[in-house]
């Protein structure tokens, strides 16, 4: 089950989501329909951790998304309709996403990422948007 509990997202002064409450039962397939600017893309990008809500909670199978992003990403399939999927990710988030698609655990991702960042002298850029 996926639950959005009072989820809001504000970009600068623009409110993209305003207290969204939504429950999607396990096994259901849904579509989001609405006019431009209604918050459809923001809702999906929040669910797959491309962006983070300003407030509220997203719960997937009883786990709060912000405290367990990698484990939850393993349960959700997402294909972007535009090539901007990676434009707002930090280096750390990008490699977590790529590694999780290969079935790596969070510990494996952290260990491997630490090794690669040190190898290429990139540690100082881990949390910068790429």
Language model region names:
Residues 14-15, 70:
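Short coil-to-beta microelement around the adenine-binding A-loop and adjacent beta1/P-loop entry
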Residues 35-39:
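Walker A (P-loop) phosphate-binding loop of ABC-type ATPase nucleotide-binding domains
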Residues 56-67, 71-72:
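Conserved ABC transporter NBD signature motif
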Residues 96, 100, 107-125:
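Conserved ABC ATPase "signature" region
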